[in-house]
Amino acid sequence: MRAEGTTAGSLADDADDPDADGADGAEPTPAMVDEPARSDGFVRGLSEAIGGPLGEHAVRPPRSEYGGSRFWTPVRVVMALALLTLSLHWVQKSPCRDGAWADLSQYKYFCYTDVLALYYAEHLNEGQVPYVDHAVEYPVLTGMLMGALGLPVHALNQRDPSLNPGRAFYNLNALVLGIFGVATAAMILALRRRRPWDAAMFALSPALFVSATVNWDLFAVGLTAFFMYAWARGRPALAGLFLGLATAAKFYPLLLVGALLALAIRTNRWRAMLYTIAAGTATWLAINLPVAARYTASWSEFFHLNRTRGIDWGTLWYIGEHLPLGGGRYGLYWFQRLNEDPEHGRLNSLYFGLFLIACAAILMLALRAPRRPRFAQLAFLVLAAFLVFGKVWSQQYVLWLLPLAVLARPRWGVFLAWQAAEVCYFVAFYGELMGASGHAVFPEWVFVFASILRLVTVCVLAGFVVSDILQPERDPVRQTYDDDPDGGAFEGAPDAGYLPLLRSWP
């Protein structure tokens, strides 16, 4: 993909070179490139098994004439790891790729994917066009992707009836989503040229391994990563374009505007953010208005479903509704009553109100912090709050948090604890699905406690991010960079003159 003469591949190549310009304009030297075995206590402890970190006076391999010190540079290693993880994910899903799901095999082998299930449920196998022929529960750009990949497969199947259309559709989607997954790793590398090993947290993520093609979320994750890169490089209009595209694919990228708003208030710098919002709005409208005008009922299905949807698996509200109380009793009465309203008005008001309170707290944190927080830190906190208090927390939503977690707090210890909790939830969720299908494999409390573990680890990770904001000298990114490599127009910006007045507000 080309953006103002720059390709995603060249971005990763830039990160390959330790002498490439840093985000703050300085030229990193090899000594300025972070080495986790030195800077991360968890990795340093693991490195003792192979002799410990590289010594201060160790001789590094000579640089080649092509700019890299050797072929397997950190960037190439990370990109290879991302490809490996996504390839292994494809293998892990292989028992389900033929679409012949019998005797709950899609749950027994942990290989269920909405991509294949919805190929038939949304009538893509019949050549129908999303929004035109029927309503789709996803935002417009995701529906367009479904149709753009489904129609060619249907046409091929018409010519060759021996083709398994479900398998072909899944494989094609896995390829496209894999490209966006690798592109996300490339964007993280481009944003962290002095910290290339941070991107390995994304590339090696167990959550990426188990969830990459459960749904089309990697499509929006990749577009969001492009948005963050364009913003960091001071291209607000291009950032707005990608923000509009990402929001047209999944609604969650819109939440990142809240982080930009908090930084704009703190610095009194508004122009770049307003350009981005304007470009994003124009892009979103250009994609949505034609569909909304001609196929209003189909277009509005996404909003109707989200408004009327009840308590979903694994959320805070599900935990309250099914909390084990002993004696075979489950659920707190007040939580159970929330799900009785067919329109779920009380539930919507409550979760949205709690989310707004959390956003207000994040804004106060951004204004009262001793140093301006980084964009990725605030973005992670806003999105984490949305998931913690939301009424839907699907297993693949972990992909939303992954890049932001890496950019917000690149420390392996807590990150791996969170990933372990996500894997526990993944396994428990498939057991829960089998139970819902009449083949119980464990008591309800097992899934409830897996849900609690996931929620708690996300909150703990958010707590560490808050701690880094309040004690910026502990922020690992600011130990490598002078300021915020993702900050864009806010990087190096002084606090607004009115900030002391805002801080004095109770």
Each predicted region: which residue ranges?
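Membrane-lumen/periplasm interface segments of specific transmembrane helices
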Residues: 273-355
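Multi-pass membrane glycosyltransferase architecture that uses lipid-linked
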Residues: 2-300, 351-506
